[in-house]
Amino acid sequence: MDSQRELAEELRLYQSTLLQDGLKDLLEEKKFIDCTLKAGDKSFPCHRLILSACSPYFREYFLSEIEEEKKKEVALDNVDPAILDLIIKYLYSASIDLNDGNVQDIFALSSRFQIPSVFTVCVSYLQKRLAPGNCLAILRLGLLLDCPRLAISAREFVSDRFVQICKEEDFMQLSPQELISVISNDSLNVEKEEVVFEAVMKWVRTDKENRAKNLSEVFDCIRFRLMAEKYFKDHVEKDDIIKSNPEVQKKIKVLKDAFAGKLPEPSKNAEKAGAGEVNGDVGDEDLLPGYLNDIPRHGMFVKDLILLVNDTAAVAYDPMENECYLTALAEQIPRNHSSLVTQQNQVYVVGGLYVDEENKDQPLQSYFFQLDNVTSEWVGLPPLPSARCLFGLGEVDDKIYVVAGKDLQTEASLDSVLCYDPVAAKWSEVKNLPIKVYGHNVISHNGMIYCLGGKTDDKKCTNRVFIYNPKKGDWKDLAPMKTPRSMFGVAIHKGKIVIAGGVTEDGLSASVEAFDLKTNKWEVMTEFPQERSSISLVSLAGALYAIGGFAMIQLESKEFAPTEVNDIWKYEDDKKEWAGMLKEIRYASGASCLATRLNLFKLSKL
């Protein structure tokens, strides 16, 4: 049976190719030509049969009662000859050269002449090219040409990145209906409805005279009951444009009653703009007005989670619910890496080693990735200028700092500091660290970068602590740690730098210290229950967690060996003690650990 299907498919492809090649030859040799399409000053000889087979528009035209002379020469108004030429060649060859400069014109013309094959190719092309800079234009095109597939794709792209895109100039040029199609969407990726309100009012003020009259209609798409009541009173009720609009003022009164717990009776004739029409049929069920809609946006399911990143996957752990969620596959992430989450909740991974055969001067490179929270994919960024390991990572004002470490080619200790600017998308060097060090740790807080401990050139642990001010470009000493150490955990917890475990001159350590940033003093905290190195500390939602690391474990041979452990502990501040939470979380194996905010709506529970 399979062989019969394969034969049938082979014959179909052969016949299709034969037919296509034959048609192309007939056009090029101008054989059996029975019509000419005219666009501007250009003429295009064609075959009625081919045009009719590929386009319902031309089929209806050639089968109509129009006199024969008009069928022989068809004048097409407002058609770019170059675009028409591309479409005709596609009909005869199944090949078309789409690019960013012509795709919208080809799309519009194929829509006008009802050529579904070209239309579909253009839709697929535009969907793949969606970007923050063009998504609103593509949304507008999809709505204009009544193409739900394209309009929905563009709208979902805008919704996922609403906080960024609502600041663009193109957003301010949306028509009222285009704006409504965006802000009525349940999928809007906003943590607070206040963001939607502020974007709408900025849109209104861009053309206040003309848009104030559309405010009532747009108003219905804002979900005011999701706002804090204080914000509603301070910013919505007191807005000068809202106060001067009688129609909107009636809705404000209803909303004030709703905040007081008095909802109106649902009505089948209730205004439904923003109540869900764009997301599906609303039917005849009783509805509240759209502005009373209290269904959370998809972006409102954001939660503080611990992100575990290893060379297999990035998994988010919720310590409150003891649940794990798949965030992204991570097969391209190197096992020995460092990771960082920025103040803007952007996750970066740096490290590992690969060979760039095209780079003859510096073939060894270190990976650099960023996690796209929308697509759950890792985006490759420019690699480190010099491959290194055992370095520290910091961040200030969205710039990433790679501090010291070991050169992967020479194994020499480093004091150099690299800075990545995401706007320029390139690396540069900044002020060197005062000493060469590796196996240290780096943490950022309040616009400063702190470098702690590590091993120096003589392979001895240091207790030195440095602070870097990016604005001044200098490193300064702070009070040293009580215990010199390397390969330890660090976190900012309740305004203090907390360090735990690590390697000392005497071996593995269980000691924990906290540095008071205000007093420049270290204090001893309760020891961790087990001596460990490479332990991860994470401060999440006011709680401090310790995850994994390496401990000396007795083997069956009775010998002790450094062994990876994958448990989770929580520091109970009131009792000043460590409490075990999970004996093993398998996703922690070989993982770096971060405190981040992720949208549960987009994640799959494991």
From Swiss-Prot:
Residues 135-237 form the BACK domain. Ubiquitinated by E3 ubiquitin ligase complex formed by CUL3 and RBX1 and probably targeted for proteasome-independent degradation. Quinone-induced oxidative stress increases its ubiquitination. Kelch repeats lie at residues 346-398, 399-447, 448-495, 497-542, 544-599. Gene3D superfamilies: 1.25.40.420, Kelch-type beta propeller (2.120.10.80), Potassium Channel Kv1.1, Chain A (3.30.710.10). It is found in: Cytoplasm; Cytoplasm, Cytoskeleton; Cell projection, Pseudopodium; Cell projection, Ruffle. SUPFAM superfamilies: Kelch motif, POZ domain. PROSITE patterns: BTB (PS50097). GO terms for biological process: myofibril assembly; protein ubiquitination; regulation of myoblast differentiation; regulation of myoblast proliferation; regulation of skeletal muscle cell differentiation; skeletal muscle cell differentiation. Its main location: cytoplasm. The modification Phosphoserine is found at residue 3. Residues 33-100 form the BTB domain. Keywords: Cell projection, Cytoplasm, Cytoskeleton, Endoplasmic reticulum, Kelch repeat, Membrane, Phosphoprotein, Repeat, Sarcoplasmic reticulum, Ubl conjugation. InterPro entries: BACK, BTB-kelch_protein, BTB/POZ_dom, Kelch-typ_b-propeller, Kelch_1, KLHL41_KL41B_BTB_POZ_dom, SKP1/BTB/POZ_sf. Involved in skeletal muscle development and differentiation. Regulates proliferation and differentiation of myoblasts and plays a role in myofibril assembly by promoting lateral fusion of adjacent thin fibrils into mature, wide myofibrils. Required for pseudopod elongation in transformed cells. Interacts with NRAP. Part of a complex that contains CUL3, RBX1 and KLHL41. Interacts with LASP1. This is Kelch-like protein 41.
